[in-house]
Amino acid sequence: MGVRAQQKEKTRRSLVEAAFSQLSAERSFASLSLREVAREAGIAPTSFYRHFRDVDELGLTMVDESGLMLRQLMRQARQRIAKGGSVIRTSVSTFMEFIGNNPNAFRLLLRERSGTSAAFRAAVAREIQHFIAELADYLELENHMPRAFTEAQAEAMVTIVFSAGAEALDIGVEQRRQLEERLVLQLRMISKGAYYWYRREQEKTAIIPGNVKDE
């Protein structure tokens, strides 16, 4: 990459970081202005368009980065698990670390998941589906259950984790510790329940081949 390209990428990075820094519990992405973001990044407003078509493209880039950042951290957590440790507890701890270190990135995902922009909703949904798919892959490999079971389990776990994450944004250290313990318990219940249901379906199939009743 040439010097000019490096400088352009550096400025683009500054714009993304400037936008993230201006988000807060009281301020959503929709309230940000191009001028404010450009000023925070140290460039002229007109220079913004050399890097993004408009503010929405900047926001979509931020959504993609937030999702990727979270998935990368969870991959690292699974590597730590491979060296020993509780799967669920390590994953919960890693997720809470992400929220503690990147609250605005998680706020962006939460808010735009149900925001007014169809493009933003689709982008967040896509990131969540990536997250679910990677977790389902891991569960399928570790638990040796069919894909349909691991996808259902992964979706349930991600739904609960994101809900807990929203709560974690606005509570203190001790309350967050209690939330983590509750989340670990809930995820273990889902995990045990998924395995129990799978074993039950296996037993029913063995007794009556090809005839599994949905209850």
Swiss-Prot record:
One of its GO terms (biological process) is negative regulation of fatty acid biosynthetic process. One of its GO terms (molecular function) is DNA-binding transcription factor activity. Keywords: Cytoplasm, DNA-binding, Fatty acid biosynthesis, Fatty acid metabolism, Lipid biosynthesis, Lipid metabolism, Repressor, Transcription, Transcription regulation. Residues 10-70 form the HTH tetR-type domain. Residues 33-52 bind DNA. It is found in: Cytoplasm. Coiled coil: none annotated. GO terms for cellular component: cytoplasm. Homodimer. Represses the transcription of fabB, involved in unsaturated fatty acid (UFA) biosynthesis. By controlling UFA production, FabR directly influences the physical properties of the membrane bilayer. This is HTH-type transcriptional repressor FabR. It comes from Escherichia coli O9:H4 (strain HS). The gene is fabR.
